[in-house]
C-alpha cells in the first residue's frame, strides 16, 4: 500500500449509514479528529474519509461496500477508514477490497485518529477489530460542545443487546449489554445545553435495559430524573424501547414531567403470536396490547410509533392479515416497516419457508398504505388546536420543528428563533406533517 500524502490543512469527512446510534458514534469520532487538529471537510474533498457502516440488512452491507468504492474512485490518495457494524462483523471483506486503510468496529474508536496516522505509512490495511463479545465496558466518547450548535442532540447512553431475536445480527455486531455511567451522560448533556442545545434524544441499542449491568441502581428512570433538573433543557425524548422493559417508574415520569416528550417508540415487529414466537420476541400480543391500553389511560395524548418486520420465515398470508388487524386496532401514529432480511449467522437465516422477495415487497406496500391513512387520521385531530413546537431549522423561508408527539410542523420564519419552544396553532395537515402559525399573546 503506497504512502498517503497529507495536505497542509488536515481535513476529515464522515459518511454515516444506518441508525441514530451510528450517527452519535460518527459525531463523537469527528470530535476526536477536531481535537487532534483536523477540520471538517468543506464540499467533497478531504484527506480522510470515515465510513460508519451498517449491517442491519443486506442492503446496509451493500451500501457500505458501494460507498467505499465510490470514495476510493473519487479520491485515490485519501485515507479511508471504516467503522460500525459491518466492519465489526466482516473486517476481512474490507481487507480484501484493497480500498480501505483502517478497519475498526465498535471498540477502540477512541484511537481512530492514531490509527489513521499510522495508516499513512503502513504497507497493509490496519485491522483493529477486536472480539466484541469479550468487551464488558461502555466505550465513553462525547460530542464536541464547541462544534456546530443545533437544537436537538442524540446522546448514546447504552451499547449492545442481550435479547438475541432470531432475525437480528446486531447483538453479534455490538456485543453484550453495556451502559454508560450516568454522571458521564449527564455531564455531556449539560455541556451541550450550555452551548444552546434544547432537546436531547436518549439512544441505545437496548435502551430500556440501561443501567442493569452497572449494578449500582442506575436505570433509565434515574437518568431521566436527573436530566429534568437541567434548567435550560426544554425537552427529553426517549429512543426506541422494548415494551417489556418499560417500567412503572418510567411511565410515572412521562406522566408527570412536562419536559419528557409524550411519545414512545415501542417495536412490535409482528401482529401474529406465532411469528413473534419464531422471532424469539419476549412478549405476546395480549401483553403488548394491555400495555398500550395502560399507557393511553395514564398518559392522555401519548403518541405511539413502532417497528414492523414483514415476510419473516414462515409468515403466512393469514399471519400477515393478523398483523394488519393488529395495526388497525392499535392505530400507531407512525410505523417503520421493513422486509425481513436473511442475515447469515442468525438462527432465522436457516429457517425453512423463507418468504419470496416479491411477497415481502407487496406486504411492505400494504402496511405503508394502511399506515398512511392511520397517520393522517392521527394528525387530523390537531387541526385548529395549539401544540408546542421547538423551532429547529429554516427551509425556504419557513421554520421546521417537532411537536411533543414527534410530528414535524412548518411555521413562518418571521420573528421565530431557533431553540425556542413556541405555542403553534395548526392551520393545515399535509402528507408528511402539519402547518401552523405562532400564537402571540
Residue ranges and their predicted role:
Residues 266, 307, 327, 335, ...:
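Hydrophobic, well-ordered secondary-structure elements that form the walls
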